[in-house]
Amino acid sequence: MKAKPLSQDPGSKRYAYRINKEENRKELKHVKINESSLVQEGQKIDLPKKRYYRQRAHSNPFSDHQLEYPVSPQDMDWSKLYPYYKNAENGQMTKKVTIADIGCGFGGLMIDLSPAFPEDLILGMEIRVQVTNYVEDRIIALRNNTASKHGFQNINVLRGNAMKFLPNFFEKGQLSKMFFCFPDPHFKQRKHKARIITNTLLSEYAYVLKEGGVVYTITDVKDLHEWMVKHLEEHPLFERLSKEWEENDECVQIMRNATEEGKKVERKKGDKFVACFTRLPTPAIL
């Protein structure tokens, strides 16, 4: 008889840890951290440990993941993710999401962007279940531990498939920045259609990105870098920004060093290929 994995064995420490974290998530996920009993008692929440959130490195974007998504952006209740920005009188949000990290992984980029852009709501979209849970728990802990300063209230994560449902979440021209950091390279040619940058998807990104907005890309795979640059340069609504612009942009510096994948590449002394593109004005129809 095959033994159960440790994560499913009721007698294991890992199982107990995951059950405890799941209960904490249910309790804290949709409440204002400064109103929780933990903060009132002055307690700190330990940051989650990745080893308890085992997940495959990649997920098939074409599979049916039974994801929840709104019919339209107007049907999305953002107050569950950003309760600090909900108007108590009318129940409406005081801000909209303007920065999106597509395939946010373990959330390192968002966490570094949060204090750098305190006036912007930042959303990470991640398709993998356990990775999303990890980022949720990480944000819960960070919000709790910096409650006196209302820290990290402007970031959150959403389990979603950006290749299928991005326009369901964002209005036309809503975003000012989109990040694609170390995406799945899909090396095999028959898998290239699953890459996050394609001609079709770029038209959707152009729709939700405002004119003058920026698409940020970074990867350690030269072939993928050349693929993304080629497709973005061929698209009529994007234009590459200069190397000088990249060197002086705050987001590029954060993007190079904040993500877990970026740190791994740094440890291995690998290359990081960066390319940034601005959203051009939509041509007038005569």
Curated annotation (Swiss-Prot):
EC category: transferase
Catalytic residues identified in the record: 184
One Pfam family of this chain: Methyltransf_4
EC number: 2.1.1.33
Phosphoserine sites (modified residues): 7, 59
Binding-site residues, S-adenosyl-L-methionine: 103, 126-127, 161-162, 181, 259-261
Gene: TRM8
Localization per record: Nucleus
Annotated source species: Saccharomyces cerevisiae (strain YJM789) (Baker's yeast)
Signal peptide extent: none
One term under GO cellular component: nucleus
UniProt entry keywords in alphabetical sequence: Methyltransferase, Nucleus, Phosphoprotein, RNA-binding, S-adenosyl-L-methionine, Transferase, tRNA processing, tRNA-binding
Function: Methyltransferase that catalyzes the formation of N(7)-methylguanine at position 46 (m7G46) in tRNA, a modification required to maintain stability of tRNAs; its absence resulting in tRNA decay. Both the D-stem and T-stem structures of tRNAs are required for efficient methyltransferase activity.
Full protein name: tRNA (guanine-N(7)-)-methyltransferase
UniProt subunit comment: Forms a complex with TRM82.
Catalysis: reaction(s): guanosine(46) in tRNA + S-adenosyl-L-methionine = N(7)-methylguanosine(46) in tRNA + S-adenosyl-L-homocysteine
Record pathway: tRNA modification; N(7)-methylguanine-tRNA biosynthesis
GO molecular function, one term: tRNA (guanine(46)-N7)-methyltransferase activity
PANTHER family xrefs: 3-DEOXY-D-MANNO-OCTULOSONIC-ACID TRANSFERASE/TRNA GUANINE-N 7 - -METHYLTRANSFERASE, TRNA (GUANINE-N(7)-)-METHYLTRANSFERASE
InterPro entries the UniProt entry points to: SAM-dependent_MTases_sf, Trm8_euk, tRNA_(Gua-N-7)_MeTrfase_Trmb
Family: Belongs to the class I-like SAM-binding methyltransferase superfamily. TrmB family.
Source superkingdom: Eukaryota
